[in-house]
From Swiss-Prot:
Belongs to the metallo-beta-lactamase superfamily. Glyoxalase II family. This is Hydroxyacylglutathione hydrolase. Zn(2+) 2 binds at residues 58-59, 129, 167. It comes from the Bacteria. Its EC number is 3.1.2.6. The lineage of its organism: Bacteria, Pseudomonadati, Pseudomonadota, Gammaproteobacteria, Oceanospirillales. CDD domains: hydroxyacylglutathione_hydrolase_MBL-fold (cd07723). Keywords: Hydrolase, Metal-binding, Zinc. It comes from Marinomonas sp. (strain MWYL1). GO terms for biological process: methylglyoxal catabolic process to D-lactate via S-lactoyl-glutathione. It catalyses: an S-(2-hydroxyacyl)glutathione + H2O = a 2-hydroxy carboxylate + glutathione + H(+).
Length: 257
């Protein structure tokens, strides 16, 4: 199984899953139909499945048109009745080619947000807008408590898990992360690497969970020095509880320029 991105809009990635023994592909969050259809036409592939992480248009906008070209199953949040043929929720399992993906509910960015995890030789997490390289999704519908719970869930996955977020936000995320931890050597090194990748117009994703634990402020909101910096940016006293500390980091990011 291989996974690679098709760029869409300004900074979206439609992740394509393919298997060497199949002419079919799966598309993750196809916000634009023509991107997927053009790929299928050019490489003589057939769309055999769609995974949706949440309802936002840049993740679902191409699904209806793709369904007109393919009778493939569409897995996603159960309330998307016009798009989803196979509604799923936390703990459900989906067979993608020969690999099993387990659904992990991660409300926060949206209330319906789902991630898809496959525990294989190299574990895979399709994280949608919940976790990015160096960042997490803006809290649009959920609560800070819910998003922290999602971060804790993801932190419990194997350290070698490859994380496929759906936006190329890394350099902007790192600018904020470095404002909190300017002396974090892992963060500095990763930022240099990612700047080079973007100069070459290459994606900075996927990332590895072990790297995120060392560099991503939303997986590090328990670190004392980071908490202090986030609170200072908000002109607040550092929170003493985990939810409050995470909230300060998220709100500091929201107002960061």
């Amino acid at each position: 199984m291989t996974i690679f991105p098709l760029p869409a809009f300004n900074d979206n990635y439609i992740w394509i899953i393919q298997d060497k023994d199949s002419s079919g592909i799966w598309a993750v969050d196809p916000g634009k139909a023509d991107v997927v259809l053009n790929f299928c036409h050019e490489y003589q592939k057939t769309l055999t499945g769609i995974l949706i992480t949440h309802h936002h248009k840049d993740h679902t906008g191409g699904v209806a048109e793709l369904k007109q070209h393919s009778n493939c199953p569409v897995y996603g949040p159960e309330h998307l009745t016009e798009l989803v043929t196979h509604p799923v929720d936390d703990g459900d399992r989906i067979l993608v080619f020969s690999k099993v993906f387990t659904v992990i509910a991660t409300p926060g960015h949206t209330l319906d947000h789902l991630c898809y995890f496959s525990e294989q030789e190299t574990p895979i997490l399709l994280s949608g807008d919940t976790l990015f390289k160096g960042g997490c999704g803006r809290i649009m519908e959920g609560t800070h408590e819910q998003m922290l719970a999602a971060m804790i869930k993801i932190s419990g996955l194997p350290n070698d898990t490859l994380i496929y977020g759906t936006h190329e936000y890394t350099l902007a995320n790192y600018r904020f992360a470095l404002s909190l931890e300017p002396n974090n050597k892992d963060l500095i090194e990763s930022n240099i690497t990612c700047q080079k990748l973007r100069t070459e117009e290459k994606p900075t994703l996927p990332t590895k969970l072990s790297i995120e634990k060392k560099t991503n402020p939303f997986l590090r909101s328990h670190i004392e020095a980071l908490k202090i910096q986030a609170a200072q940016q908000l002109n607040e006293i550092p929170a003493e509880n985990p939810i409050g500390a995470f909230s300060q980091v998220r709100r500091a990011k929201d107002s960061f320029s």
